[in-house]
């Protein structure tokens, strides 16, 4: 990741262009677009990718992980429907960019990362930024039972199923956005899952995506 946290006029200009590109791609939630405009994506990338930081593409961040393309971050965040003050659980901290977008929107963000090296690298970056994110090294399938319940849960990796432990940690009326492995095993379908009053789940599908797999346990890659 980039150790230079400078955010200059050029970076801000590129972010404005990115926001307009996302608007053209169908992102309509102004709170999401404002957050994308506020969070400096280039600081989460390796210095060799800084010049490309505001293009709509994913980049490797080490430990076999990627930073999702901005349109995917914006799409998932828009589906989540975050309101200021909500408790949001993120599974897969990765670079920390998605967590900062959520924090910029006023969410109380709790984020789990399973890759030890990536966890500490990202934690160091986050501590130098103005966005408040609580990070945890752990297994995303288990969630954070001691911090439950959550208003929103966002998963940033492809999951084979909806983890039962995470459902238990959702408030009634809470929403989970999760990329679920499709039947062919060649990608994911984006699901919006709402927990109803009787405890059942309402599931809505929102198109095909490609994510790294959601893995169990703590990794040392």
Residue ranges of each PLM-predicted region?
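Class I SAM-dependent transferase core
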Residues: 1-89, 97-101, 105, 118-121, ...
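Conserved nucleotide-cofactor-binding alpha/beta core module
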Residues: 81-201
